[in-house]
Amino acid sequence: WTPQTREWDCARACAACVLGRRALDAARRRRSTWTIDLAGIFTAAGARGVMLVTKTIGVDPRLAEDAFYEEDYLRDVARVNAAFRRATALDSPVRVVRRRVRAGDIAAIVLNGAHACVALVDRRGLSPTETKSEGFEGHYVVVEDANVDAKTFTLMDPAGDARTKGRKIVTWSCFDDARRAFGTDEDLLFVSLRAKDFNVDAPRRFA
């Protein structure tokens, strides 16, 4: 578990939870990190099997009206759309797939053990008792484990309690509410953990 050190660096911390120090070496400290940026951090750290599953290719223009995004939106939109164009090229190390994914499918992938899963969520959705205000609080978590019978996920949360090393158990329905909130685009990153899918010469710097 790697805790985040600033309120905005959960993406970088999640990359370190999966790949360790090599991810920290590859990641630039950027206040605004989109999921396509996080995919770039993984590939810069040496991961070759990286897949971004999302319901929106590029930037959803409606996000310009959301308080969470508006401060960085104009600065980010051109960069993020360009990153998506590069990622959809035939020779890209990142595979981008436009689709929605069911909780049961996420559980099957995680339980297989061959891939790590990082999800973009509305942080407030992971705490059903928290009073929700208007808007969106984007946050990245690692889906560490799943229990199909109980229909629960074990999440590794970089903003979680140090006493549990950030672990938190949530129901599938709670997780679905958090990851399907407006602002997430239902983004999921699947990163191969197989040794053959890593470049031993990494990390390089991801800008």
Tell what function each PLM region has.
Residues 1-59, 111:
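Active-site nucleophile-adjacent alpha helix/oxyanion-hole segment immediately C-terminal to the catalytic cysteine
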Residues 111-112, 122-138, 144-207:
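Noncatalytic regulatory segments and standalone regulatory/sensor domains
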